[in-house]
């Protein structure tokens, strides 16, 4: 794709957002109104420029005749949330090779805003409704407080547990009375907090 001007990028982003939220592209008048153009004709000129660069196709005869030509996956990558698969030791959790797919889920549905999804494995957090196969929405941060549910990496394992720390001692607490807490001594073990759990997308098999 040829480089876009800042204004063209704004128009393209508006088209993507409108299609994501409503299922339809915006009209020329809507583009003009939302981006502050003086007229729908100004919006039309930007659309023609995007078409010339191979980003969209203009369909004649309809006010919403705009079709995205960029790959659907590219749209998902920009508007959805990545699903993280198996994580290699020593690699950033959001490294491209860890991303299995993208889900068309609005990150702003969660507070704080979600940065990625992680598929839950096992029933260690079942007492608070986080079940095997669920998708856990995660806000990427290393700043967490005692009592919060976190995504932590210990050696090569990524786990979801409730966080508790006192000095150099950390306990990763399950929400399942059949399992024992994981004790971590930060003076001799490396623990990485990958993020804070901010929501759950239920596995349909449980419903």
UniProtKB/Swiss-Prot annotation:
The record marks 89-90 as: Cleavage. The keyword Iron-sulfur does not apply. InterPro entries: LexA, LexA-like, LexA/Signal_pep-like_sf, LexA_DNA-bd_dom, LexA_repressor, Peptidase_S24_LexA, Peptidase_S24_S26A/B/C, WH-like_DNA-bd_sf. Residues 28-48 bind DNA. Keywords: Autocatalytic cleavage, DNA damage, DNA repair, DNA replication, DNA-binding, Hydrolase, Repressor, SOS response, Transcription, Transcription regulation. Its EC number is 3.4.21.88. GO terms for molecular function: DNA binding; serine-type endopeptidase activity. Belongs to the peptidase S24 family. HAMAP family: LexA. This is LexA repressor. The lineage of its organism: Bacteria, Pseudomonadati, Pseudomonadota, Gammaproteobacteria, Aeromonadales. The gene is lexA.
């Amino acid at each position: 794709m040829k480089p876009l001007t800042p204004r063209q990028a704004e128009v393209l982003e508006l088209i993507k957002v409108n299609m994501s939220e409503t299922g339809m592209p915006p009209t020329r008048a809507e583009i003009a109104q939302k981006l502050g153009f003086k007229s729908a004709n100004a919006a039309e000129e930007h659309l023609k420029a995007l078409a010339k660069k191979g980003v969209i196709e203009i369909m004649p005869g309809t006010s919403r005749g705009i079709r995205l030509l960029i790959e659907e996956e590219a749209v998902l990558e920009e508007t959805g949330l990545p699903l993280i698969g198996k994580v290699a030791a020593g690699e950033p959790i959001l490294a491209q090779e860890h991303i299995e797919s993208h889900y068309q889920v609005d990150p702003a549905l969660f507070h704080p805003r979600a940065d990625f999804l992680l598929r839950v494995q096992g029933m260690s957090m079942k007492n608070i409704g986080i079940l095997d196969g669920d998708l856990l929405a995660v806000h990427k941060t290393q700043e967490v407080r005692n009592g919060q549910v976190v995504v932590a990496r210990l050696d090569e394992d990524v786990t979801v547990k409730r966080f508790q720390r006192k000095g150099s001692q950390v306990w990763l607490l399950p929400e399942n009375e059949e399992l024992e807490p994981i004790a971590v001594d930060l003076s001799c073990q490396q623990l990485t907090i990958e993020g804070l759990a901010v929501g759950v997308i239920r596995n349909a098999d449980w419903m």
